[in-house]
Amino acid sequence: MALKDLTLIKTHLFFCNGGTCKNKGAEEATAEIRRLIVQSGLGESVHTTKTLCNGRCKDGPIIISQPEGLWFREMTMHKAEFFVQQYLIKGRVPERIRLYRYGEPQINVAESSQAVEG
């Protein structure tokens, strides 16, 4: 495997692949987002890592984005393109699936993000 040039990375995504998130489709969502990252030409600037449980099972599958300190919820394969287009390509934080931002006093309790499907 080739060595990754860490100096090119702008965003590091952590994909929860703990038991509950896996049961909710985390593996498929992870694979699809990784595919879209490469397809969009972002493979050098976006690094991805699978993790175990991040402690927000009811909101899963979870993605954490660094260095922004953003947590995203309910990340299914069906939301992958929306996430990549809005967040990684356009640089917009999709509020409907944002769970938390470091430093905020509370979790974003907006309605379920199911409306983002498809």
Predicted regions and their residues:
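Compact Cys/His-rich
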Residues: K24, E28-E32, L36
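Local cysteine-cluster metal-coordination motifs and their immediate loop/turn environment
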Residues: K10-A26, T49-S65
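Iron-sulfur (Fe-S) cluster-binding modules
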Residues: M1-H12, K24, V38-V46, P67-G69, ...
